Amino acid sequence: MKKKETKYSLEKEIREALASGRSQKSIYNTLKDGNDDSVLADKVAEYLPLEVRNKTKYYNYIIIFLLVINAALSMNFLVIILAFFLFFYLKEGNGFGYRIMFLFSLLNIMYAFYTDKTGLVLVKTVLWSLLGISGILFYKLVFTNKTISGKVKKDKNDNYIFLD
């Protein structure tokens, strides 16, 4: 006999999956492939509003634009290759790309300080790198369901806020 899923048990499963560190997109794609869990997959999709996905897409374009300018300012062949590598991660909306972008900005600051550059180029490189870091923090605060300290955000009714 098949167990009937209730709204509470579906939400509980979603929360447990999110608490384990999986993204909603990952859960949704995994469940959509299986026949038994399609109801749960649709439930996950309800928690990811379309406007949130669209905002994330536009934010990706801004980060890609900053990334190209950052690579052009540094004039380093390896940095330009890394920029193209990151472009594809950001284009796919993979959260891993944002982590690499954060590290890329830190490396660019270090690169600016340890190379012999004129003062103006040094200042521009540091400013673009800081802008990239602040962009990552902005993304983390606005478009994810976790705070900087790693706690899951909740709304006024003590429900989890489900954002990818």
Model-flagged regions — what are they?
Residues 2, 20, 24-26, 40, ...:
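Non-transmembrane, interaction-prone segments in cytosolic or luminal domains
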Residues 54-164:
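Hydrophobic alpha-helical bundles in membrane proteins
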Residues 1-4, 56:
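Basic, amphipathic alpha-helix used for nucleic-acid engagement in HTH/winged-helix/SANT-Myb modules
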Residues 3-35:
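Short, non-transmembrane cytosolic segments of multipass membrane proteins
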Residues 29-69:
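Cytosolic juxtamembrane regions of integral membrane proteins
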Residues 3-7, 11, 37, 84, ...:
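Short, structured coil/loop segments at alpha-helix boundaries
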